[in-house]
Amino acid sequence: MKIFGITMGDPAGIGPELILKLQKDMEDENAYVIYGEEYILKHASSVLGQNFYYEKVNSVDDVKDKGIYLISLSLKGALEPSPSSGKLAIAYLARATADAISKKLNGILTMPINKYFAKASGFSFNGQTEYLAFADNKKDFAMMMYSDAIKVVLATIHIPLKDIANAINVELIKQKIKLIKDYIPKYFRFIPTIKVLGLNPHAGEGGLIGDEEAKIIIPAIRDEDVVGPIPPDTAFIDIKKDDIFLCMYHDQGLIPFKMLAFDKGSNVTIGLSFLRTSPDHGTAYDIAYKGLARVDSAGYSLELLKRYGY
């Protein structure tokens, strides 16, 4: 039996609804521990008209059999978008992360948080990915968007576009390549073909449209078994099953990914000591508790945990 953790995310968003909709996916030989509050689950269950069956426990140590469990932190907070809802989301993330690091869990699925309200609550990180790496004491990590159709890894994550050229360097790119080579065979059990994108239009056009390719990317990949630098506008024309694209910035990778796999992909943090997955969308405050949330990405994220978590 494996034990997986699922954080509720921002309770003002669609995280609680997604958890309810995953109930049938959790009716197997594994144990699933939800980090959240009972009153939130009951509210979601009432609004959506769906029964949700679980057992309350104080810690993962109390989980002895398959089923769905709830660890309540006994926190009160708003069910409307606010620093209060952001604070709850971070509390659930912190508790689940601690249990994953201590090997009490075989992996975690984190429901979406809102970066603005998380920051407003005192959270000092740009996102869950950065927090997870800090808590796990990992300096080398990366955000990977994973699907059957396309897989991308980001060299930089949540930084402004104007700062990207100064953020990339030879060491950074080598580090991301090593992460991919080490992590993918370990967790996902295949040897990837790594395709490195250029930063500039046409990958710099021989230095006519920027020199980051010549000064940074080419030196970084010269002795590596990778393909690149590839012009970003043609990189995704021909995608093979084992391809992993190393993209220089967030939207360079996320735009093609969400076009091809928005409802069938997952956000995976590579470099951690455990497997973490997350839906590839946000809190969707505008449709929360209306029964409108699509569970596809959350379901795929859970499936990855079950398939590859250990």
From Swiss-Prot:
Annotated binding of a divalent metal cation, by residue: 158, 202, 250
Cofactor: a divalent metal cation
Keyword Membrane tagged: no
Binding site for substrate: 129, 258, 267, 276
Superkingdom of the source species: Bacteria
Cellular component, GO annotation: cytoplasm
Major subcellular location class: cytoplasm
Keywords, ordered alphabetically: Cytoplasm, Metal-binding, NAD, NADP, Oxidoreductase, Pyridoxine biosynthesis
Disulfide bonds listed in the record: none
Molecular function, one GO term: 4-hydroxythreonine-4-phosphate dehydrogenase activity
Main EC class the enzyme belongs to: oxidoreductase
EC number per UniProt: 1.1.1.262
Annotated compartments: Cytoplasm
Note on cofactor: Binds 1 divalent metal cation per subunit.
Catalytic activity from the UniProt record: 4-(phosphooxy)-L-threonine + NAD(+) = 3-amino-2-oxopropyl phosphate + CO2 + NADH
Pathway this chain belongs to: Cofactor biosynthesis; pyridoxine 5'-phosphate biosynthesis; pyridoxine 5'-phosphate from D-erythrose 4-phosphate: step 4/5
GO biological process terms on file: pyridoxine biosynthetic process
Purpose: Catalyzes the NAD(P)-dependent oxidation of 4-(phosphooxy)-L-threonine (HTP) into 2-amino-3-oxo-4-(phosphooxy)butyric acid which spontaneously decarboxylates to form 3-amino-2-oxopropyl phosphate (AHAP).
Family: Belongs to the PdxA family.
PANTHER family: 4-HYDROXYTHREONINE-4-PHOSPHATE DEHYDROGENASE, D-THREONATE 4-PHOSPHATE DEHYDROGENASE
Miscellaneous section: The active site is located at the dimer interface.
Subunit architecture: Homodimer.
Name of the molecule in the record: 4-hydroxythreonine-4-phosphate dehydrogenase
Organism: Hydrogenobaculum sp. (strain Y04AAS1)
Gene that produces this protein: pdxA
